[in-house]
């Protein structure tokens, strides 16, 4: 897979084993991955225009002041139609089209991100992409 800045993925999780497992699997699949363990670190990464982030996975609950919902809002400033993959205590629907998963496994996160990216290469209508994956949120 060719390196494309729109395919750069930011993985935000406080669990280092979960975060690095997902990151390593995505790197092994050929994706460019950046990680963060706090919302503040992730926020700065999202604002770094020299290395734009194309896709975002985050925990809803993060330490300090910036949580996953704030990160999703920041991400949507750049990609209003692309869904964010969010891990929350319970899966649910999102008014923004985000994919909210209830306590996902690393394998689930990997598969959802790969499906989103692959579908975006076939069809730029990311809003349609996310709606097809909402079934994982329930």
Regions found by a protein language model. Give the residues of each.
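Non-catalytic signal-transmission and effector/linker regions of two-component phosphorelay proteins
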Residues: 1-16, 81, 90-138
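Two-component/phosphorelay signaling modules centered on CheY-like receiver
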Residues: 16-34
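Hydrophobic anchor at the start of a short beta-strand
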Residues: 33, 83-84
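Acidic, metal-coordinating helix/loop segments flanking the phosphotransfer/catalytic sites
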Residues: 37-55
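Conserved phosphotransfer cores of two-component systems
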Residues: 48-51, 75-81, 90-91
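Conserved phosphotransfer microenvironments
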Residues: 53-76
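Hydrophobic/aromatic residues positioned on beta-strands within the core alpha/beta folds
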Residues: 86-88
């Amino acid at each position: 897979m060719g390196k494309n800045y729109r395919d750069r993925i930011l993985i935000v999780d406080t669990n280092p084993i979960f975060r690095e497992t997902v990151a390593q699997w995505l790197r092994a699949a050929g994706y460019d991955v950046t990680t963060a363990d706090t919302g503040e670190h992730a926020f700065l990464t999202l604002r770094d225009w020299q290395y734009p982030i194309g896709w975002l996975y985050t925990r809803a609950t993060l330490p300090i002041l910036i949580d996953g919902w704030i990160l999703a809002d920041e991400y949507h400033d750049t990609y209003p139609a692309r869904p964010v993959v969010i891990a929350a205590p319970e899966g649910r629907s999102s008014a923004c089209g985000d994919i909210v998963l209830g306590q996902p496994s690393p394998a689930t996160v990997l598969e959802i991100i790969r499906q989103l990216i692959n579908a975006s290469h076939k069809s730029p209508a990311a809003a349609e992409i996310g709606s097809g994956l909402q079934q994982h949120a329930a």
